[in-house]
From Swiss-Prot:
PTM (free text): Transforming growth factor beta-1 proprotein: The precursor proprotein is cleaved in the Golgi apparatus to form Transforming growth factor beta-1 (TGF-beta-1) and Latency-associated peptide (LAP) chains, which remain non-covalently linked, rendering TGF-beta-1 inactive.
Glycosylation-annotated residues: 76, 116, 125
Ranges for region Straightjacket domain: 23-68
Gene giving rise to this polypeptide: tgfb1
PROSITE patterns documented for this protein: TGF_BETA_1, TGF_BETA_2
InterPro entries in the record: Cystine-knot_cytokine, TGF-b_C, TGF-b_propeptide, TGF-beta, TGF-beta-rel, TGFb1, TGFb_CS
Region (Arm domain): 69-264
PANTHER family per UniProt: TGF-BETA FAMILY, TRANSFORMING GROWTH FACTOR BETA-1 PROPROTEIN
Species this chain originates from: Oncorhynchus mykiss
Descriptive protein name: Transforming growth factor beta-1 proprotein
Length: 382
């Protein structure tokens, strides 16, 4: 009986939250009030994800100082990767769910210039990575990114690009990607998170990947009919310049520093659904557009890029959900029996959320980080 009473108490609290929460609504509310409260919620959310106790103080020189090109390159690559993954659903593991809340620091590591570019080897300085990342960092995601340049692919032809971990006789197959003419001037990404985790925990000073085309037994070795930007052998000043170009093969790495992953919060990732935007005639749960301007709405000058973003929010009534699939149906029925005049109506809540990459600075130090679950893309009744 005590357990039932506790569950009923929890449901009463749930109803109160539904009536007052600004992210989700169970009844019609003043939209301006919802907007103001949503903006204030975002203020606290961003500071919390960055583990900042308060807004950073503005350094006038830092505000006008130009962001280094290397950081802009990292930021642009992060934005591109986020856009590519918008419609990709990746089943989340328990570890992924636990680390999803806090902002991820983003680092970009270009490949080392190698004498073996003709063999399509991509080498990385692991000592440099360990020096930059430190030892107590939780690796969240690592993507090997290659910019495809069309060389001899015909309209109706394609080649399968195979990625191997290691080079030479020790190379081990990881995954592949089909490349056709439509991939010209586009980035191909390979998830190499597990491999990077193992390399970072090891002691090797240099590690690499190898690119190959599949070999059919008894047939001549197939030639690459496309090029990968930055892998051609260059000389002199041209080589030095190429090493700094954003089109060179690189690893984009997102991680949690020790002070963030020591107190992980669990946030559940959900499968992507279609985006349902509210209209003037909407009478059910939907996404209402809301643009947040960091300077105008929050009074912040310490976020350099972007200047704002569409945070959006969920609003609209939800009908009662009484079905066998709802694991709370029996508890709700019991609650309804003991409280015939009360309501345990479901709320309109976010279903799919997307990340927001930012460049911000504390004092005169610029950083690139990715804030998870910042953009509401679809809603559901729950």
């Amino acid at each position: 009986m005590r357990a039932v009473c506790l569950m009923l108490t929890a449901l009463l609290m749930l109803e109160y939250v539904c009536r007052s929460d600004t992210m989700s609504t169970c009844k019609s509310l003043d939209l301006e009030l919802v907007k103001r409260k949503r903006i204030e919620a975002i203020r606290g959310q961003i500071l919390s994800k960055l583990r900042l106790p308060k807004e950073p103080e503005i350094d006038q020189e830092g505000d006008t100082e130009e962001v280094p090109a290397s950081l802009m390159s990292i930021y642009n690559s992060t934005v591109e990767l986020s856009e590519e993954q918008v419609h990709t659903y990746i089943p989340s593991t328990q570890d992924a769910e636990e680390e999803a809340y806090f902002a991820k620091e983003v680092h970009k590591f270009n490949m080392k210039q190698s004498e073996n570019t003709s063999k399509h080897q991509i080498l990385f300085n692991m000592s440099e990575m360990r020096s930059v990342l430190g030892t107590d960092r939780l690796l969240s995601q690592a993507e090997l990114r290659l910019l495809i340049k069309n060389h001899g692919l015909l309209d109706d032809s394609e080649q399968r690009l195979e990625l191997y971990r290691g080079v030479g006789d020790k190379a081990r197959y990881l995954k592949s990607h089909f490349v056709s003419k439509e991939w010209a001037n586009r980035w191909v990404s390979f998830d190499v998170t597990q491999t990077l985790n193992e390399w970072l925990q090891g002691a090797g000073e240099e590690q690499g990947f190898q690119l190959k085309l599949p070999c059919d037994c008894g047939k001549p070795m197939e030639e690459f009919r496309f090029k990968i930007s930055g892998m051609n052998k260059l000389r002199g000043n041209t080589e030095t310049l190429a090493m700094k170009m954003p089109s060179k093969p690189h690893i984009l790495l997102m991680s949690l520093p020790v002070e963030r992953h020591s107190q992980l919060s669990s946030r559940k990732k959900r499968q992507t659904t279609t985006e349902e935007i509210c209209s003037d005639k909407s009478e059910s749960c939907c996404v209402r557009k809301l643009y947040i301007d960091f300077r105008k709405d929050l009074g912040w000058k310490w976020i350099h890029e972007p200047t704002g973003y569409f945070a959006n929010y969920c609003i609209g009534p939800c009908t009662y959900i009484w079905n066998t699939e709802n694991k709370y149906s029996q508890v709700l029925a019991l609650y309804k029996h003991h409280n015939p005049g009360a309501s345990a109506q479901p709320c309109c809540v976010p279903q799919v959320l997307e990340p927001l990459p930012i460049i911000y600075y504390v004092g005169r130090q610029h950083k690139v980080e990715q804030l998870s679950n910042m953009i509401v893309k679809s809603c559901r009744c729950s």
